[in-house]
Amino acid sequence: SGQTMNLEEKLKKQQYKEIWQQYCGFLDLSMDGYMKIQRRLMEEQIRLWSNCGLGQSILKGKHPKNLDEFRKMVPLTTYDDYADILLAKQPDMLPGNPVIWIQTTWEGGKHPIKVAPYTRSMLDTYRNNVTACLILSTSKEKGSFDVAATDKFLYALAPLPFATGLFPLALREEINIEFLPAVNDAVNMSFSERNKLGFKMAMQKDLGFF
């Protein structure tokens, strides 16, 4: 069905209107329409979060039903408030099943790193967002863009488990853009090695994105 086609397949079929609508259609929403969607999504998350161990570690038995109740019942938190559960990577305490754990450094924290769980639906949202960014970065006006599977992308990113490492993986599900150097090689290099080789390859092959 049309639903399961990815960006590359739609480009092959020259479905440019559908591509724009799917990934960039949100730009046509009014502020009210946009906020309505945001509120609905937020309330969905509140429901899931309130019913899991992580949420209840903050809520202590309370169950906010909407955004206003959530704001009244839930204090401002920092990573510190979630650290014990997240650092132990306890999936049964979370609102969804994590398929990957991302990490960042934790300056001044009680542990050298912070970890964050990503569920499949979070990765799907991330994939849609990076694809929209890719399209918009080549766009001069509404509906016009210039993306092709033959494009080259400089791999100047920190690899997994850092969040930027998700980028090539997410994009690969949509379009087989070539990274310079190739992702499998890049992840085993130091940052400077990766950049030096990437720029060298770009001079030989050309470069569409960085």
Region locations from a protein language model:
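Nucleotide 5′-phosphate-binding alpha/beta core
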Residues: 2-103, 107-210
